[in-house]
Each structure stands twice: as C-alpha cells, then as structure tokens.
Amino acid sequence: MPARTVCFGSPCRAATLSALLWLAVAPSAFAQNASGTTEARPSDVAGDVGDGGLPAGLIQTHETAPELSIVNELYTDGDETKFKKDFEKPFQEALKSSTLTDNDKKAIDAGAKYWVYRFTMKKYYEEEPPKKADKLVPQKGAPPRERLHNLRKNLIDVVRNNAKITPVAREYFLRQVTKLSEDLLDNNLVVRQNILLLLGQLPMDNGNIAKGIEPAPYIPAYTVLLKVIKDEKQHEAAKISALTGLLRICRLGLAAADPANDKKRAEIAMALVPELARKDTHWWYQFRLAECLGVAGVTFDPGNKNNPIVLQTLADVVADKSRHWQARCEAARAIGRLPLDNTLNMTPVLFEIVKLGNDMAQAYNANPKKDSWANYFFTLYLAFKAENSKPETHIAGGKRKPGLLEALPPKEVKDVYEQVLQMVSHLVDNPGKQYSAEQLEGIDTWLKNHTPTNKRITASSPEIGSKPVPVPKPMPANGKASTPPTAPVAEK
C-alpha cells in the first residue's frame, strides 16, 4: 500500500472536553443527515449551498442539557482554609508512611476529600466575568468555562510528582479518591465529566516516559466508570468520558492474559454490549463503545460460551445502514481485535465489511468532499491490520497481533482484504477523485458472487442485521444480579 501520512482515528478520538460539552448543548448537531441514515441523498450529489458551514437541516432546535445548570457544592472556601491549616502538612507526611496509622488514614481521607470535593465548587467551573475592554458578555445558555482540568492535573501530581510517596499510601489515597468520586455523579455535567476523566487518568505508578512506558492505571476505578455506563439517566457526554477511562484501563491495565483480568474485561464488555445495541444514541458514543469493545477483547458472553454476543453486536453495527459511517467502521476495526476461533462462521461478517466499503464508495462518489472519507476508509482498513501510529502488539488476553489477517486463515480473509485495500488505495493515490464505474462494478460483482447463503455466525445466532441482539444482563461490580436496562426512549 502506498505510504501516506494520515491521522488514524476521527476527531472524536482526539476530542477535547469542550467538544463533549458541545455534544451536551447540541445533541443532534452531528447527525449524518436529517433522516439519520448513511444512504446517498440528492444533496450528496448536488452539494450543499456554497459547500460552507453545516448542511441544511443539520442545525436543529435544541435546549441546553439541564445537567449544566446543577449547582451542588460539597466543599466551601472555609473547608479549603481549614484543610490547609489543619491537614495539609499531616497529609503530606502521611503519604510518606509505609505503615498507615489511624491518624495517617485520617489525614489522607481529608486530603482525598479536599482534592475531590473541590471539583464541585462553582468558582472552578462558573463563567468568567465579561471582559471590560471589549464588553464581551457570556452567551446565554453556553457551557461554563472550566478550570477543572487544572484540578485534575494537580491531583495527579500529588502522586506522580511526589518522590517520597509510598506504594501503600498511594493505593490508599487513590482508593479514597475513587470512593469519593461516586458522590459527584449527580453533580453539574462539567463536574461529572472531569471527575470521570480523572478516574481514567489515576496513575498506580509513574511509568517510564523516557522508555515510552505509560503509567499504569488504577484498575479499581473501572467500577465507578461502569456505573455511569449502566445508568440510563446519565448524559451521553458523561458516558463518553467514562469510556475514555475504560479504554485506558483495558489497554494498559487489563490486557495481559490473566483470569482476574479476563473476568474484569468480560464485565466491561457485557456492560457495553446493550449500550451499543441501542440505535437511539449519538454516533460519537456508538463509535467509542465499539472502540472500547475492541480493546476489551471479549467475543463470547461469559455466561454462555455458545453466544458470541460481542461479535454479533459489532457485526450488526457494521451491517446497519442507519448508523453513522464512523460507528460502522469502528465496529469493523473492533472485530479485528477480538479473539476468534474456528467455531465461528466469519464468512457473513467479512461480507458485511466489504459491503460497508461498497456503501461508502457509492456515497463518496456522490460527494467526495462531504465527509471524512479518508478517516472512514482507513478505520475500515484497520480491521485487517494493526495500527502503526499507535503500536498494537497483541490483542487483549492473547498473543496474536490485531487484525483479521492475523486472526483468520489466508484463504478465508485474503480476498476480502484485497477488496478493501483497493478502495483505500484509491483514496491514497487519487484523493478527491471518484471511483470509476469499472471499480464500482468490480466491487458489486464480487459482492454478488460472494453473497453468503448462511448469514449466521453460529448455528444458534440470528442472521446478521436481522433482528435485535439478545443482550445479557449487565454484570455489576458487586456480583449481584441487576435488572435489565429498560427500553431506550428516543430523543425528542
């Protein structure tokens, strides 16, 4: 494949918190088109007026998320003063202790509360006063300007930049931070997002930046992040922040083959499957769910080894034309990161991946400038290959490299890969130029000649895309049975 410098991953993957807040303020602004489908439309062919700004029908009436109006301060200026006066020095001393006394724990408890509860103080996230020079006035209903990212950084520095902190003190402090964070899950949306991002960033060690070794995540934080994912009342912007942490924990903390790790990754995957099976959620959320399922590396329902629930759900997303290109392509990429065995009929899955490429080629020809086509096609390409720009050495819990070329016999996957490779190579060699009629006809002929007669992954599986996937009950962190998620309510 010709060499080319590309940015793997959509803007979503490198999204800022402010963009997540925009999702809270304009929940429908990212819709691919007014009907919510990915089919080519007349406007795709004709182009939108001036090809500038957002297409007609994309901007819709919306209201600011009510979660942005919540004010529930759990800490005061007086509490800050009291901590600095009475507990700051004992807190710093306690972090040096290798055997924590009751007084040490009391000091660390106070320190954890100081660092966590301050996130709820309005002064750290309220709108700044208007500038007098240009008389700028904050836009009514706009999300508050935040300074909470500084609190996140400073809290992490408490353990990362403290050369004298002991392992036992670090673990106890992180445990208390995680525990107290649960008290913020019904606070202002900005507060929730920041505390959830923090949980995914908590470092169990300092890593070795010089050698490219990232700090290990604090794995127990995943239970709080999963609590947000399972809560149907949580805003999707908060859930996306939770997924960011789960991605890091799965990638850096749970990837090694180990029974305990396998159990946690399965618990995470089973919580994500019913969320991805829903169709009424934002495409950005769906994209991140698929990405996290790929990193979790679980194929089967741990309660039923004959049910490849994760693979089935991802394959259904790939085949679903009502979903966004990014979600569908990321689902294909995630499939290449699952452990696959010879009990699975992968023929219909591979067929749907090529069919997705064909769908995109048709839509690309309708309007080559309309979407992030290069990103979509390269994400689809990564279903077969490991990502070089962010080295992927092996799938979670396994030894093989990511990608369907590594997972399946060459005779089963090589021809499929070549079909996708041709589509991607066209964008590399001819950016902005349409596929020729001969190219499209060739893909169409291949699809007609390779249409599978059996569209089931296993004998007991539903046909891909035929009906809703039977999702398992999410497994709670406490191990107790939980009630199944209620039917989703469509956004008004």
Q: PLM features: residue spans?
A:
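N-terminal secretory signal peptides that target proteins for export/translocation
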Residues: 1-12
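N-terminal acidic, proline/glycine-rich, low-complexity intrinsically disordered segments
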Residues: 2-4, 31-35
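Bacterial N-terminal signal peptides
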Residues: 13-28
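Extended repeat-based scaffolds of very large eukaryotic assembly and lipid-transport proteins
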Residues: 34-290, 301-309, 325, 347-354, ...
